[in-house]
């Protein structure tokens, strides 16, 4: 709003003068042109400064929950002011922290151009389902008489997961020949369970140690000496 007066008498807009503006939207120097009409003639100009608005005056929409990916998550907030959506790189820039692992990530919004200052918004990163991972097949194992606990190779997004950091393992039916099961339970950045099986094959008798049989004395009957068979690998 402007006031125009002459000899302490306030002039009337659109009766004594008209007003036009230039460069009066964005941050910088704007110009008002006052042009006389009626009893007045000529044009005078006045400048005024438009300064940046604080970015905290904007409205930042909620960021949907994100799911762990193994990489940095750069969720984009929707930022509006006065009904208009701001443009990243023109009105603001974004930086992120704590945006890889499960927990609360933060995006810091820094004003640019017509906006100044900083504000921030948080978002949640939830664990990835263990069923989304890839579990490599385990080759057949041979019976040993002991518990057999092979370690599976588990990957997600081309990255190998770490036992006891990303998952834990439990085994069942993993002693005797047959089908054994591994249950994989997510931990940390992973949640839920998945399972896989592997085969335990019979051990060849050729690998057993058979004791020497002492000479037997004729009895006139079928002789069945005791034989000691041992598995030296057990």
What residue ranges belong to the model's regions?
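Serine/threonine-rich, repeat-prone extracellular segments and beta-strand-based repeat modules
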Residues: 10-41, 46, 85-121, 160-193, ...
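Solvent-exposed, low-complexity, repeat-rich "mucin-like" stalks and linkers
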Residues: 1-9, 47, 51-84, 122, ...
């Amino acid at each position: 709003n402007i006031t125009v007066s002459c000899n302490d008498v306030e002039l009337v807009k659109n009766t004594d003068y008209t007003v036009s503006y230039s460069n009066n939207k964005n941050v910088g120097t704007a110009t008002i042109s006052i042009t006389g009409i009626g009893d007045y003639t000529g044009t005078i100009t006045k400048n005024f400064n438009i300064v940046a608005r604080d970015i905290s005056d904007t409205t930042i929409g909620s960021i949907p929950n994100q799911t762990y990916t193994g990489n940095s998550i750069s969720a984009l907030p929707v930022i509006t002011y006065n009904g208009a959506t701001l443009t990243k790189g023109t009105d603001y820039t974004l930086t992120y922290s704590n945006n890889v692992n499960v927990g609360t990530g933060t995006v810091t919004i820094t004003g640019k151009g017509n906006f100044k200052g900083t504000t921030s918004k948080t978002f949640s990163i939830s664990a990835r389902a263990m069923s989304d991972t890839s579990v490599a097949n385990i080759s057949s194992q041979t019976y040993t008489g002991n518990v057999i606990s092979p370690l599976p190779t588990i990957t997600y997004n081309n990255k190998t997961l770490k036992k006891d950091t990303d998952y834990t393992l439990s085994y069942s039916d993993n002693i005797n020949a047959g089908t054994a099961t591994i249950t994989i339970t997510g931990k940390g950045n992973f949640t839920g369970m998945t399972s896989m099986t592997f085969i335990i094959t019979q051990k060849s008798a050729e690998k057993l140690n058979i004791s020497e049989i002492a000479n037997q004395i004729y009895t006139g009957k079928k002789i069945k000496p005791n034989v000691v068979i041992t598995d030296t690998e057990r």
